Amino acid sequence: MLGLRSLYIILFCCVFTAQAQHVFKGTVVDALSSVSIPNAHVKLNDSYGVVSDENGRFELSGLPSGTYLLEVSCVGFKGFKKQINLTKKVLYFDVVLQPDILELSQVDVLGQNERLTNITRLRSIEGTAIYASKKNEVILMESTLANKATNNSRQVYAKVPGLNIWESDGMGLQLEIGARGLSPHRTSNFNTRQNGYDISADALGYPESYYTPPSEAIQKIEIVRGAASLQYGTQFGGLLNFRLKKGENKPLEIIVRQTLGSFKLQNIFVSLGGSKGKWNYYSFYQKKSRNGWRPNSNSEAQTAFSSVQYQANDRLEFGLEITHMDYLAQQPGGLDDATFLSNPDTSFRARNWFRVNWNIAAFTVDYKFNERTKLNSRTFGLWSSRDGLGVLDRIDWSESGQQRDLLLAEFNNFGNETRLIRRYLIGESESVFLGGVRWYRGFTVKEQGLADSGSNANFSFENKLDHYGSYFEFPSLNKAVFVENLVRVNDCISITPGFRYDQILTEFDGFFHAVVNDSLYYTNNRKKLERGIFLAGLGVSYKCFLGGEAYANFSQNYRAINFNDMQVINSNIVIDPDLEDEKGFNIDLGLRGMAWGVLEYDLSVFYLNYSNRIGYLSDYYDSVSAPEPDDIYTSYRLSTNIGDSKTLGVESYVSWNVLKSFTDIETQALNIFLNTSFQKGTYVRSDEPSILGNRVEYNPDVNLKFGLQYQYKSFTSSLLYSYTSSQFADAQNTISPTQNALFGEIPSYSVVDWSAKYDKEKFLIEVGVNNLLDRSYFTRRATGYPGPGIIPSDKRNYYLCLQLKI
């Protein structure tokens, strides 16, 4: 009996000891900004409790197994309750708190000053994605002071280091940003997405973005640099993802915004959204028009969006989204250098038009197997077109009333991306596995020929088969598998290896014909490229660095030949028939965090290696190569693999909460921020002697933005100074401009913008002045639309916005 009793006691002690070893830990974060929340009270069954630390982390140990009621509360946030089942040794759980917005009529208190610092970072794990050790930025649009009616990129992206911005139109119809010496052309060096799915014309063959969501509808913009290539696609620039707003936690909320501005700018934006039961919905409609500050630059656009989410149960959620955008823009064409210096508001093209019709649909499924395992599947399609009409001859040649060139393009794409994320334990440290697959099918049709000789927006061919013209089909197919694994070595160090394998098919099939010396020539072209691409990456993060984080990342990149690189008819451009795909890698090394609760920083160095870089060489037609006799001895751009480049740079963002450093005043705040980028891009290999050792084009040495932001109760004001040093427009580093303005230096420029708003409960007023000092400058030399030639940026302009929330 004694032996049996002793055995019972031993077994009981073992069970009790096992029960006492359970640990419950996690992080408390803000649902709106993804910022960690300190001082949150975490309780289990009113028996166990703890307060989250300065990084939002909490841990409860010595817990017996069983079912618990988890309750989390924090001042300024809505309470959180959830039943959890504690059976495993260590249970990780992230708590997401919704802000508790109170409408105060008598007292105005700013509370936390994050509203001024509208930049934050992605958490290591967001939904079914891993961002640990990756350089990234998140722009919170609700706190961004900018001319949102025109999507003013200079203001919206003011706190993102190193971005080179093209300003091609004054109404924000197309976003054009680049980084680290990558061309800003329609943001084609980023993988551009909306709510996680593709929105560009063709993700591989034609990654240009003709659609940009209205700033008024965006909740936040997520930017992940080149290390995003493993999860989101192979682009050197990384990921640019627009997260649109969702319905508030109320049955119905209506927002109406009316904006008026210089050059007859008119913008109306209406949104409605809400939640009821298991349903959440959000819709908006925007219509805007503008005459432009140069002649022949009228434009009008409209955008509509609707989304609905259905939470079937605690595990399963469905979502459906539909987007439509269309616009018609008259384009005044480019200028040569002499005209820009003397009369930048001149236009030599009165018959150029551009038309876009963009349609996107997406269906999403989110399924939670348990607290550790989640699945996300996105199925999306795009049915869109873009058409260009006008005279694309050299800008230094005057118009003679000839027939206009017409370029039509249709894009029909369909794809699915499914990813699974799984949290697991290595010892007592939680690690995270992410695996995903992608299937993407694209089909693009491009036609080019002659239209009428009129001046209206008549997008119809005339005698297409009797004169010159072309018709090409561009099918593309992409199958990919990707894996990343976040391994936490301990509470401080994590390592994230990963890889991606893509099967890529791009091809074209079609013909073009032209009249040469009164004879009609037909040429059939067909080309097919099929290849497999393997990319690898590795990231390391150290989070016990004085309240901050040290991070490092290496990731390979790849860029497939663009459809435009395969075939184009443009007297300004000639395509090398032996083009090859581009490849390379990004390296980031940096420090980021918050010091003393008032100084936010992200300091990093990067290295970009770019092989087989496609660019332009300057050349001249001779009697054999000239497409027309009049073209002999005129210059053109040859698109070819010009060589290998490397870019090394320093990117930094620092924001100082001045008043919080010296006082405890809660009714006002003053922030100063400095965003700088110093970089040097050089061609280190080239078969062209005129290229080797040259600077990379569209890669300014210095890119700086300095801002002041002041807030007093409901009033906020912001002053922004932007400076970009001189840069080259071609790889041959042409300084003296050519007559057609395609080649030459882009001089340095500086711009000042001022914005202010008064936000009082349901009523809001926004005012501002862009290009406050009325500088005359330009950011690009265009080879085709909207040029060719120099595209002058807007002169000083004003805006006023009134908003009503119901």
Predicted regions and their residues:
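Transmembrane beta-barrel wall of Gram-negative outer-membrane proteins
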Residues: 23, 253, 260-289, 294-330, ...
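Short acidic/polar hinge/loop motifs at secondary-structure boundaries
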Residues: 197-225
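Membrane-embedded beta-barrel scaffold of Gram-negative outer-membrane proteins
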Residues: 270, 279, 364-390, 541-543, ...
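Structural signature of Gram-negative outer-membrane beta-barrels, strongest in the C-terminal barrel
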Residues: 313, 429-434, 438-440, 472-609, ...
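Face-selective signature of the C-terminal outer-membrane beta-barrel domain
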Residues: 314-325, 356-513, 543, 602, ...
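Surface-exposed extracellular loop regions of Gram-negative outer-membrane beta-barrel proteins
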Residues: 328-343, 443-450, 505-517, 528, ...
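Gram-negative outer-membrane beta-barrel transporters
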Residues: 420, 491, 605-609, 629-733, ...
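C-terminal beta-signal and adjacent terminal beta-strands/loops
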Residues: 611, 618, 659, 670-672, ...
